[in-house]
Amino acid sequence: MNQDAVAKALLGMAEALRTQDPPKLKMAIKCARSTLSMEISDEMKAICNLQLGKLLFFYTDNFELAKNHLQCAYDKMSAMGTFYTRDKMNAISMLADLHIHYQQWPLTSIKATIRHEITTTRGFPALSNKLMFQLIELMKIDKDVEGAIEMCQLAINSSHADPKMELYFRIAKTLVTYQLMHEEPDISDVTRIGSMIKVMENSTTSDKAHLECIKDFYVCTKLAYMFYEGKSRTSRQLLRQIQKSQTSGETKIHGIRWLGEPSITLLACVMNQICALVQSNTDRVEKYYHLVIKHADEIIFKSTRSPQEPGVVRCINMIKMTTLEMMACCNVLACRPQKTLHNVRDMLEWSNRTSGPLLTRYFTPHIHYILGLQCCYFRQHENAENHFRAAMKKLHKEDITAHNTMALLNLNLAITYLNQLKMADYYEVSENLTAPKISSCSQMLKNNVKLLSAFFAYITNKLNECKLLSHEVLDDSKAEDFFRLHGLGLLLLSLVTDVDEKGVRPTVDWSKKSHDHVVILFSHSLYEKILLAAGYDPKSELMKMVVSEQLASRRMLSVENLTPLVANMPASKLLQWFDGDPFKLLPRDETVL
């Protein structure tokens, strides 16, 4: 038996080990790796490198080694004629996934290689379409707006014979517009997508299940932009649409699929959670939090047994981290610091356990932001400042949402300085929040900057300006149901002009639902003054309730109440973590997941 035959036998053994139940992956990788120590032909070397690269790609965290073997396979197959075209395209597709989902290497070479394959290779439309999607994604990572739009248009033009793929690429073009340009797509593009969907819905030959998947992609693309902008009220119809589209079982789809039904159901849950957070409905946030964590863990567990594409795994990991972050923010407002620190610890643990650097890179600034908020409630102002600055330092400036996140951190740092009347520091930070510098940020952030400006105007005795800005905040927040922002704007307005019972009563009512003790305290205090001025009996049941809520929230907000809640928690040391390895502050045997 020659060496090539032995290598084939070893690859067969590796595949048998991989498909066992349970799989023996380490042994499978050893078998595949051993083939490369043999004297085999270049053709066999290409095949062995591809198989070993695939095993490392799907089943290990050794991305560098996977990349090297896949690159070797691609280079060798490129010189071996058309027989290996499919394998060669699979190799470059996996290399593209590694560059997209782990972002550890320069993108110039992989983009050029994919473009070459797209323009020169024929006969494998599904793989060519996948490579076009991957090239668009790589250009988005590079923030190459022109290149991404150009690639979308090229893909659209090459897909006229396949309406479903044309639709996918047209929707991808709107996604580029939303993510990189932060604006609505051209009306003609939207009209064209709508007309194509209608034609397919009326067609007797169209794949209905696949069409529903494409529609989900379109709706979620639009929803993501609406949530970025803070369009809570106007997103509700689309949110209901994505909920109704979910079914109980996985449907069979031929061709490219955006997300499987379990994943898209999970995405719908987290979008509902975002909507609930914006509307200050803490109980609803917590309800979806438990649902998302349960189902995300189930999907992640299954992915360890049956390989998933990195994009799907990354999506689920991002969803899990996002829901932990939202729950942590709600726990800060509800004066539950012990639960906040549990959420933070879970975020650190999960990003540390999960393959690749992206979760840690993306969410570390968010973790510092949460810890900064919590320090504000402990009146640890210096620690809060340090956390916000640490978040700015660790923020990856090339991320798509980095500009908005940086503005949010500057906003919170400015509020922290203003609360302490550190005016020189406030002026320095507020320079980063001028209208030109936040022009490309979300409308929600701009509204919060407007509230900060109103607060500053009040402190500096510019009462007319404070009144004007407060009214603008109320109008903006009422339009999209930003209940907390509306409540804070109303309370600030009450400092410079009279507010009646009709105006403050809604804030009093929803503040209890939000468990936001800052707003509960101040809204009930204002409500008490209005009722007393209107002649209400201080001993009436209504007045007793108002006073009782004030006292309860004042007690909850007191440092004397908050500090003992975390006094014996090892995770409380994270409040002093600003740099370095956070796990050095924590006992390694503590398990929270």
Curated annotation (Swiss-Prot):
This is Maternal uncoordinated protein 2. Plays an important role in the loading of the cohesin complex on to DNA. Forms a heterodimeric complex (also known as cohesin loading complex) with scc-2/SCC2 which mediates the loading of the cohesin complex onto chromatin. Required for normal development until the fourth larval stage. Functions cell autonomously to guide migrations during the development of the nervous system. Participates in the guidance of mechanosensory neuron AVM by a slt-1-independent mechanism. Regulates chromosome segregation in early embryos. Keywords: Cell cycle, Cell division, Chromosome partition, Cytoplasm, Developmental protein, Mitosis, Nucleus. GO terms for cellular component: axon; chromatin; cytoplasm; nucleoplasm; nucleus; SMC loading complex. PANTHER family: MAU2 CHROMATID COHESION FACTOR HOMOLOG. Disruption phenotype: Chromosomal, neuroanatomical, guidance and egg-laying defects. Altering the activity of both the dorsal repellent slt-1 and mau-2 leads to the abnormal dorsal projection of the AVM axon. Migrating cells and axons are mispositioned along both the antero-posterior and dorsoventral body axes. Coiled coil: none annotated. One of its GO terms (biological process) is cell division. Belongs to the SCC4/mau-2 family. May heterodimerize with scc-2/SCC2 to form the cohesin loading complex. It is found in: Nucleus, Nucleoplasm; Cytoplasm.
